[in-house]
Amino acid sequence: MPHSPTRDIQITKTGLLSKLNFVVKDMCKIKNHRTSCGNPDFYEKCQPADDFAPFLKKILEAGATLKGITICDEFFYSLIGENGHYGTPTNLNAPGCVPGGSSSGSAAALTTNLYDFSIGSDTGGSVRVPASFCGLFGIRPTHNRINTEGVYPMAPSFDTLGWFAKHIDILKKIGSVLLNSNEKTEFSFKEFV
């Protein structure tokens, strides 16, 4: 992304997610950075954020390192994964094929093997479709299960955050951080279907 952070963002080196690095969809507030939501005109008008979106702060406080911001479909409005302004992210698991969207860059980034996990959003398939197209694990939790404050909406009554990983143990760790508001219960998968 032309406006990705110029250096890694890390709050702490300890925690459940320490030594894991990630990228995030161009959809949320990142302290001292602007967001484009896949549109350069929106980026030019957007003011730098005063703080991190709460979900992002939780991930950073758990020790993960933010490596960059990923391309998404313009204003999150597609399941294809193309962006006419910034280009279509390359799905290295299926070269020549679209990565699926709208969290296209978040999924495609993991096919490079440079990142441990990525964050996206899902309104009507924007995590599930790219996970399928790119051969990844992806999860869309129940609506309102994760605080979406600081996340630019597409359809607030349907929007939720989601994440991708190549390994199920990492997917589970992210769930333990994002889905446990009181830290008393551990997130777990009941069964795989």
Question: Could you describe each region identified by the protein language model?
Answer:
Residues 110-111, 116-193:
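Fold-level recognition of mixed alpha/beta catalytic cores in primary-metabolism enzymes, strongest
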